[in-house]
Regions:
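Walker B catalytic acidic pair
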Residues: 164-167
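Switch/connector loops and helix/strand junctions flanking conserved nucleotide-binding motifs
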Residues: 122-123, 170-174, 212-218, 232-237
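Phosphate-sensing "switch" segment of ASCE/P-loop ATPases
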Residues: 198-201, 216-289
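Short, conserved secondary-structure transition motifs
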Residues: 2-14, 196-209
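AAA+/SF3 P-loop NTPase mechanochemical coupling elements
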Residues: 150-157, 188-207
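Conserved catalytic/switch belt of AAA+ P-loop NTPases
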Residues: 135, 172-196
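P-loop NTPase catalytic core of nucleic-acid-dependent motor ATPases
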Residues: 28-158, 224-226, 262, 267, ...
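Intein modules and their embedded homing endonuclease domains
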Residues: 1-48
Length: 290
């Protein structure tokens, strides 16, 4: 009976070097360096993964008074070059296309150097924002071990972002080299291993309170680092500043501003690529770590 069934080729829409797509309940949003277009699904010309569809509608609106835009300015110290760098990084993470020449892991760190770093600078909220647009799997960095059986069992073929959250001191970034540049092998209990090739594998984010050790071209080609200022702490929180929880307490209008801000960051990235900025303490932090 199975021999009588014909195979059907299913074409999934994928980002390419110049084009990115975001999928909402009511439409697909096509983003290029030149503009942002809303496309009806009937005109899309292919399939999308169910888990990659964002559970809200999209419409165009102004984004200049967006909570999250102000949050990005705050964690960037209000410096224009740092804001542009963070916004271009957002665009990079929203663009599912992976360039074989350069597709680094994004490493988020604190600007302030401390013997007992407390975090709370906004790294988690930064990743949380991306997760509201991209199918994200988060791994607890404190308990993660490369030696553990099936370390990536939560990852699937439609995962777009893999985050190692709050990794420990002396995290072995070198152990991720093959994932960053070659793809990821998924192993699950009692199932055959599946190799997700580089171009379809998730982009990588690492959040940490410590310097990621490593020297040489191999390390530099595989990482893109951002420092967040100590604008937020246990006393000064986003909740206290905005009077509502980011994401959790937003109404429809604020979600509209957020979506348009993020889509514009994606458009900006497709224009400029990743924008670098000066790091205040990153080199010093690495020297201490050595």
């Amino acid at each position: 009976f199975l021999n009588l069934l014909s195979a059907v080729d299913v074409y999934f829409i994928r980002d390419d070097r110049k084009t990115a797509y975001l999928y909402y309940k009511n439409c697909a949003v096509k983003v290029t360096a030149k503009g942002i277009d809303i496309i009806d699904y009937i005109d899309l010309g292919g399939y999308v993964w169910k888990d990659q569809v964002i559970d809200r509608d999209f419409k165009k609106c102004r984004a200049d008074k967006c909570d999250y835009k102000q949050f990005i300015s705050n964690i960037s110290g209000g410096a224009e070059d740092r804001i542009k760098s963070v916004e271009s990084t957002i665009g990079f993470l929203l663009h599912s296309y992976k360039n074989l020449g350069y597709c680094p892991a994004v490493i988020l760190n604190d600007e302030v150097i401390s013997e007992n770093p407390e975090g709370g600078t906004g790294k988690g909220l930064f990743v949380n924002a991306i997760s509201h647009l991209k199918h994200t799997v988060t791994i607890d960095g404190k308990s993660f071990s490369f030696e553990r059986s099936f370390p990536y069992q939560l990852v699937s073929a439609d995962t777009q972002l893999l985050t190692f959250d709050d990794v420990k001191k002396h995290f072995e970034f070198e152990r991720l080299f093959s994932i960053v540049t070659e793809g990821i092998t998924l192993e699950k209990k009692n199932k055959d291993a599946i190799m997700i090739p580089f171009e379809r594998s998730p982009k990588i984010v690492i959040t940490t309170n410590y310097a990621i050790k490593g020297k040489g071209g191999s390390f530099e080609r595989r990482k893109w680092e951002l420092e967040f200022t100590q604008y937020y702490n246990q006393e000064q929180t986003p909740l206290k500043e905005f009077g509502r929880l980011l994401f959790g307490d937003w109404d429809e209008d604020e979600w509209c501003r957020f979506d348009n801000y993020m889509v514009n960051n994606l458009k900006g990235y497709l224009n400029t690529g990743m924008v670098s900025s000066t790091h205040k303490n990153l080199r010093k932090r690495k020297f201490i770590a050595e």
